Amino acid sequence: MTPDPITIDPQTTLPEAGRLMKECNIRRLPVVENGRLVGIVTLGDIREASPSNATSLSIYELNYLISRLTIGEIMTRDPISITSDTSIEAAARLMLERKIGSLPVVDADKVVGIITESDIFRLLVTEGEIRPTFA
C-alpha cells in the first residue's frame, strides 16, 4: 500500500492531472472533495478522454477544449474502496473479481492509502512463494 497518496479534486483539469501523473510516475489518482473520496481517475481514463489524432480540430481548438475538461467529468464515481484492516488477500480477491487495478484505502472517511496491482505483485515476489509454473 502507498500511504498518504497524492489526491486531486474534481475541478482539477485533465492536463493538470496528466502532468501530475507523469511527474510522480503514477497511473491512478483518488479524487477527494471536502475531505471525502468521491472518485478515482486513471491514466487510461485520461487517454480515453483525450481527442484522437484523426480529429479535424486545430491544435489550438484541441488545447482549448482539453483545458476546460475536468476530472469530475471523467472520473469513476463512488469507487470501490477498502479499510486499512482489510486483509491483503481480501483486497487482491476484490481487485480480481471486480477487474480493477487499485483500491483506495479509506478510514473514517479519509483516504489513507491506495493499494495497486503493483503492490500485490511486489508482495508476492518479495515475500510470497511463487510457483515455478502455472501447472
Where are these regions (language model features)?
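The conserved cystathionine-beta-synthase
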Residues: 8-25, 31-33, 73-75, 81-99, ...
